[in-house]
């Protein structure tokens, strides 16, 4: 069974220690709720990942574990077969002992767009909301973060993350907790909070922004990346049914509307640092994710539109700072 005890020990003497009042019971319930289904099968695979400590790691320019020279061809083949049992791999890429996990998303491209605009992460405590399998968490560690905590309720993402961590070394201060943000108390503790690719999946985007705000210390930085449309501060797309074949997309605002929402939630120093139309080369079917991908979500006769006729995915990155508490929002 995946254990979270080392995380509990690490935060016991930190500004996250009050989280220990509720976290163990919440994670215990999650484990009980998932003792059937795929999780036990994936945990058995994790228990087979017994490999020597890597001769090198790189989290600065990539997520690379091992040089590729440590394992024999047979050992490498066995490892690749084990890692393929965690398919589909969506966020990456990862380079593990010479094995290239070519994920659906080129998450390194997103990181390259974001990293130049954020406050330096050196010695910061970071929260990554909706972290997936943890690719960006490793890059945050490579940027000097003191501790990185990711939350995502998916059992598969947790096991993919655990696989990489067990191969990279469990001593790294990077932790994935299978939680949704609604399960977090107001921690007011993180120096930087990332929410990338989450907002449009939330039924109440304003509540999501307030939940993100509750995790930041005063003066902490929010890095928000989400789908946007063109238009003024009143422009918000509410898909009738699906958007890009996704049935869990609720609100897609314009950049101006999103900045107004953040202002209403009492963020300050709000600025849009990047907008980018998602390229077919950034999200695509691969050998490690053989299902439908972006090209199938777009109109085959006009890739500027989704199959439903909406504008094709365009993403913006907004950075904002948590202001002093507003009693009206708290109440």
Curated annotation (Swiss-Prot):
<dbReference type="InterPro" id="IPR029063">
    <property type="entry name" value="SAM-dependent_MTases_sf"/>
</dbReference>
<feature type="binding site">
    <location>
        <position position="200"/>
    </location>
    <ligand>
        <name>carboxy-S-adenosyl-L-methionine</name>
    </ligand>
</feature>
<dbReference type="InterPro" id="IPR010017">
    <property type="entry name" value="CmoB"/>
</dbReference>
<feature type="binding site">
    <location>
        <begin position="181"/>
        <end position="182"/>
    </location>
    <ligand>
        <name>carboxy-S-adenosyl-L-methionine</name>
    </ligand>
</feature>
<feature type="binding site">
    <location>
        <position position="105"/>
    </location>
    <ligand>
        <name>carboxy-S-adenosyl-L-methionine</name>
    </ligand>
</feature>
<dbReference type="GO" id="GO:0016765">
    <property type="term" value="F:transferase activity, transferring alkyl or aryl (other than methyl) groups"/>
</dbReference>
<dbReference type="GO" id="GO:0008168">
    <property type="term" value="F:methyltransferase activity"/>
</dbReference>
<comment type="function">
    <text>Catalyzes carboxymethyl transfer from carboxy-S-adenosyl-L-methionine (Cx-SAM) to 5-hydroxyuridine (ho5U) to form 5-carboxymethoxyuridine (cmo5U) at position 34 in tRNAs.</text>
</comment>
<comment type="subunit">
    <text>Homotetramer.</text>
</comment>
<protein>
    <recommendedName>
        <fullName>tRNA U34 carboxymethyltransferase</fullName>
        <ecNumber>2.5.1.-</ecNumber>
    </recommendedName>
</protein>
<keyword id="KW-0808">Transferase</keyword>
<dbReference type="Pfam" id="PF08003">
    <property type="entry name" value="Methyltransf_9"/>
</dbReference>
<feature type="binding site">
    <location>
        <position position="196"/>
    </location>
    <ligand>
        <name>carboxy-S-adenosyl-L-methionine</name>
    </ligand>
</feature>
<feature type="binding site">
    <location>
        <position position="91"/>
    </location>
    <ligand>
        <name>carboxy-S-adenosyl-L-methionine</name>
    </ligand>
</feature>
<feature type="binding site">
    <location>
        <position position="315"/>
    </location>
    <ligand>
        <name>carboxy-S-adenosyl-L-methionine</name>
    </ligand>
</feature>
<feature type="binding site">
    <location>
        <position position="130"/>
    </location>
    <ligand>
        <name>carboxy-S-adenosyl-L-methionine</name>
    </ligand>
</feature>
<feature type="binding site">
    <location>
        <position position="110"/>
    </location>
    <ligand>
        <name>carboxy-S-adenosyl-L-methionine</name>
    </ligand>
</feature>
<keyword id="KW-0819">tRNA processing</keyword>
<feature type="binding site">
    <location>
        <begin position="152"/>
        <end position="154"/>
    </location>
    <ligand>
        <name>carboxy-S-adenosyl-L-methionine</name>
    </ligand>
</feature>
<dbReference type="InterPro" id="IPR027555">
    <property type="entry name" value="Mo5U34_MeTrfas-like"/>
</dbReference>
<dbReference type="GO" id="GO:0002098">
    <property type="term" value="P:tRNA wobble uridine modification"/>
</dbReference>
<comment type="similarity">
    <text>Belongs to the class I-like SAM-binding methyltransferase superfamily. CmoB family.</text>
</comment>
């Amino acid at each position: 069974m995946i254990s979270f005890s080392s995380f509990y020990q690490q935060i016991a003497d930190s500004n996250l220690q009050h989280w220990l009042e509720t976290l163990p019971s919440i994670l215990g319930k999650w484990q009980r709720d998932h003792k059937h289904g795929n999780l036990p099968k994936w945990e058995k695979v994790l228990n087979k990942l017994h490999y020597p400590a890597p001769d090198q790691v790189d989290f600065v320019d990539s997520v690379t574990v091992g040089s590729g020279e440590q394992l024999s061809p047979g050992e490498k083949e066995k490892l690749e077969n084990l890692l393929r049992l965690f398919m589909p791999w969506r966020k990456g890429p990862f380079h593990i002992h010479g094995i290239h996990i070519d994920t659906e998303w080129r998450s390194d491209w997103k990181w390259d767009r974001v990293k130049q605009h954020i406050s330096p992460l050196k010695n910061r405590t970071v929260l990554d909301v909706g972290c997936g399998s943890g690719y960006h968490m490793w890059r945050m560690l490579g940027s000097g973060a003191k501790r990185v905590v990711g939350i995502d309720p998916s059992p598969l993402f947790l096991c993919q993350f655990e696989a990489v961590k067990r191969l990279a070394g469990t001593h790294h201060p990077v932790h994935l907790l299978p939680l949704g943000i609604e399960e977090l108390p107001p921690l007011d503790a993180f120096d930087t909070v990332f929410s990338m690719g989450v907002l449009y999946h939330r039924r109440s985007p304003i509540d999501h922004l307030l939940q993100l705000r509750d995790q930041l210390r005063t003066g902490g930085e929010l890095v928000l990346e989400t789908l946007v449309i063109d238009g003024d501060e009143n422009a918000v797309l509410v898909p009738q049914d699906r958007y890009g074949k996704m049935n869990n997309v609720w609100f897609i605002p314009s950049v101006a509307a999103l900045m107004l929402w953040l202002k209403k939630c009492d963020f300050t120093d709000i600025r849009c640092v990047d907008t980018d139309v998602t390229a077919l080369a950034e999200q695509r079917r691969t050998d490690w994710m053989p299902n439908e991908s972006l090209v199938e979500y777009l109109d085959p006769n006009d890739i500027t539109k989704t199959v439903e006729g909406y504008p094709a995915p365009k993403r913006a990155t907004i950075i904002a700072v948590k202001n002093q508490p507003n009693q009206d929002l708290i109440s």
